[in-house]
UniProtKB/Swiss-Prot annotation:
It comes from Escherichia coli (strain K12). Residues 1-24, 95, 164-175, 250-278, 355-398 are cytoplasmic. Keywords: Cell inner membrane, Cell membrane, Membrane, Transmembrane, Transmembrane helix. It is a multi-pass membrane protein. Its main location: membrane. Residues 46-73, 117-142, 197-228, 300-333 are periplasmic. The chain crosses the membrane at residues 25-45, 74-94, 96-116, 143-163, 176-196, 229-249, 279-299, 334-354. The keyword Iron does not apply. InterPro entries: DUF898 (IPR010295). This is Inner membrane protein YjgN. Signal peptide: none annotated. GO terms for cellular component: plasma membrane.
Amino acid sequence: MAQVINEMDVPSHSFVFHGTGERYFLICVVNVLLTIITLGIYLPWALMKCKRYLYANMEVNGQRFSYGITGGNVFVSCLFFVFFYFAILMTVSADMPLVGCVLTLLLLVLLIFMAAKGLRHQALMTSLNGVRFSFNCSMKGFWWVTFFLPILMAIGMGTVFFISTKMLPANSSSSVIISMVLMAIVGIVSIGIFNGTLYSLVMSFLWSNTSFGIHRFKVKLDTTYCIKYAILAFLALLPFLAVAGYIIFDQILNAYDSSVYANDDIENLQQFMEMQRKMIIAQLIYYFGIAVSTSYLTVSLRNHFMSNLSLNDGRIRFRLTLTYHGMLYRMCALVVISGITGGLAYPLLKIWMIDWQAKNTYLLGDLDDLPLINKEEQPDKGFLASISRGVMPSLPFL
């Protein structure tokens, strides 16, 4: 109750998006044409041009964002990865698997460092009212949340699953069914724990090391909450999986029967067309289930994240009021209508989605009450910093 009263006492500023679908559509058309003409070379500049348009038209508290990552930054990073890709291919073709493994491990190690430096550069190149964001973290902590923790959790999940398979009985048909149900429960809970824990720890780590000017963000997510909604999101997918699986299994049985009892080619063709129709229906049911699960998980975790994000020791807070159904039909429209129109409707629908998200995002407090001063920080220099600037061109939710 105290939090609600405090939020009612402070001014609330919703994010405002000033971009239009028509303008964004023209930008995308020009980008596609230039990318085709240049045989894909222009793609990094096209992507950054779109991102700069979105940032420049996003406003909060009367001020707009600015985004300074260039296509050249992304292009240099892409060249680095292309070089490594062909180097690994050459070692494989030259029958030097050991060298290929060493190069792959080296790329993996470099990728972790590059991701951290890329996030730092992206934050420094993003500003609001002339005040830059910044991202500073220890590489030890970054390695832990992005590499070692996921691996250890995956090993733990695999171990639990393996032990469970050995402990469950399989002496009769009924015991096999019970074992399969229990294994499914173990799998769902394990996936929920994995996804929820990683989201909670990674987002807390990233944003606790992010600053706006001289003011530091703080966020502490409830890991139990994240695990709960990760499990519920997976459970929401199960009915769709069951229906789609039943349709596919039924069609497999029908296909087997038709191969045994079919009398002529016409009957075979009719059964084949009917099978294809039902297979398409099963795929559509499955994809819709993915959309339901994804929208539920996205809205639950984003709302929780924003409600726990604060700036300058809580003087500035945030609130997100996205709804499940709002996210669901926008996601479906974005995929389905974009597919039907060959991608032509994508720019319009994306702006529609961004505008809706902006209207449901609120800043609680007044940025003008804070001393808006930039940190004395400059972008990192050197070879590793240069090739890292295009690796992470987006900080989550920034």
